[in-house]
């Protein structure tokens, strides 16, 4: 994946996150600032999904933990085999919102 494809891929991920949260009626606010996408929950807690361009990785941080994902086999996968979308669902649940991204 080249840099342009990397950015396009992550921007699609961010768009899908925002669309699914809205469609499923989650009480959250989404904001993008440069390479950082933030989901803020009603209690002001946050999930941060950000680009790590030098590594071509996608990072996720929340009170459920921190994860680093690389794009392999057409999906974002952590080194331990966890999938991005599953980790994001678990993180949202830890912040009080049940949402499905599949």
From Swiss-Prot:
CDD domains assigned to the protein according to its UniProt record, in alphabetical order: Frataxin
GO terms, molecular function: ferric iron binding; ferrous iron binding
GO biological process annotation, one example: iron-sulfur cluster assembly
Pfam families recorded: Frataxin_Cyay
Keywords, ordered alphabetically: Iron, Metal-binding
GO cellular component: cytosol
Physiological role: Involved in iron-sulfur (Fe-S) cluster assembly. May act as a regulator of Fe-S biogenesis.
UniProt record similarity statement: Belongs to the frataxin family.
Name of protein: Iron-sulfur cluster assembly protein CyaY
Organism: Histophilus somni (strain 129Pt)
Taxonomic placement: Bacteria, Pseudomonadati, Pseudomonadota, Gammaproteobacteria, Pasteurellales
